[in-house]
Amino acid sequence: MFIRLTPDISVAGQIAPEDCALAATQGFVAIISNRPDGEAPGQPDAAAMAAAAAAAGLRFCHIPIDHSGFAMPQVEAMAAELAAGGPVLAFCRSGTRSTNLWALAAASHGTDPDSIVAAAAGGGYDVSGMLPSLRMLADKA
């Protein structure tokens, strides 16, 4: 259910509020929601997820990514949350947006783009198409 990309970040598709307790038992210290509220019927909103995370003793951060794509404020927010300490579980509908946002955030802090691509591939995600952006961000770090 939770796909480990590195020791500090795992991703998942949509989780339910009760999954926060499971995440805590698996050693996660924070949950990042990358899914906008109301994206799909029946989806728990960020407030419900934040309450469940707090009840499980976890930090919670909502960095929604909609279909318009990624912007630097979102990359910076993800990087800040990752820097606050992990391991962290990030989720969206399928885990793809969370993986892509992690990749951009990691590159923005100087992580080698090829190692980012390899870590994502190890979890079943292909971010190789982002290599030019990852290299640009890593070069500026």
Positions of predicted regions on the chain:
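Cys-dependent protein tyrosine phosphatase-like superfamily
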Residues: 1-89, 100-141
